[in-house]
């Protein structure tokens, strides 16, 4: 597999890999009476090295609607959503969550969501490091992400209990979360636990 296909600084190395693969595979082909299928491109390679697609390609993360290069050219296919479980008014200077990590600097409306790190919501997203979307507006996480619940600030958002919340999806790309976590989208996706209900749609 072309290991540096997602980074332009490795293009010379990648082209060298492709040339070596082509030479070796042609040598093998001469030893077989039938055509052998050749493939070397991963998701990034499909986008950046179309001339190296040979007979097949290995669409990995691209299959899940994530591009290693440019998300504008691929449709999102995976969304993680939850709903607002409860909304409470919390006074200024009070705290939210375990270890009293969520310090409030104003009178706030705090919403509880029934999703936590046991579902795959990374704890490093808490304490204002990230946000989710409520009715299309950014709602930052307040305090620590708990095992089964997390809290968000909806003070400036028109919302009610039962409203949908997008953790990642069409309007909040998973790459936003992976960038905040300094990881890759694969890790975010594979961290979603089995207890999270999956719903599949067919177009």
Identify the function of each model-found stretch:
Residues 1-83, 90-91:
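Active-site loop/helix belt of alpha/beta enzymes
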Residues 89-203:
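C-terminal accessory subdomain/extension
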């Amino acid at each position: 597999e072309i290991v540096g296909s997602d980074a332009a600084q490795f293009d010379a190395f990648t082209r060298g890999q492709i040339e070596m693969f082509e030479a070796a595979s042609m040598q093998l082909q001469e030893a077989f009476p039938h055509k052998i299928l050749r493939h070397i491109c991963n998701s990034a390679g499909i986008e950046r090295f179309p001339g190296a697609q040979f007979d097949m390609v290995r669409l990995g993360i691209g299959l899940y609607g994530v591009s290693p290069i440019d998300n504008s050219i691929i449709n999102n296919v995976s969304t993680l959503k939850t709903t607002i479980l409860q909304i409470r008014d919390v006074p200024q200077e009070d705290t939210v969550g375990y270890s009293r990590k969520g310090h409030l600097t104003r009178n706030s409306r705090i919403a509880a969501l029934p999703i936590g790190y046991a579902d795959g919501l990374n704890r490093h997203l808490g304490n204002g490091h990230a946000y989710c979307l409520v009715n299309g507006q950014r709602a930052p996480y307040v305090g620590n992400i708990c095992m089964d619940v997390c809290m968000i600030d909806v003070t400036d958002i028109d919302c009610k209990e039962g409203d949908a919340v997008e953790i990642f999806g069409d309007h909040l790309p998973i790459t936003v979360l992976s960038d905040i976590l300094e990881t890759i989208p694969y890790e975010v996706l594979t961290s979603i636990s089995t207890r999270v209900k999956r719903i599949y749609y067919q177009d």
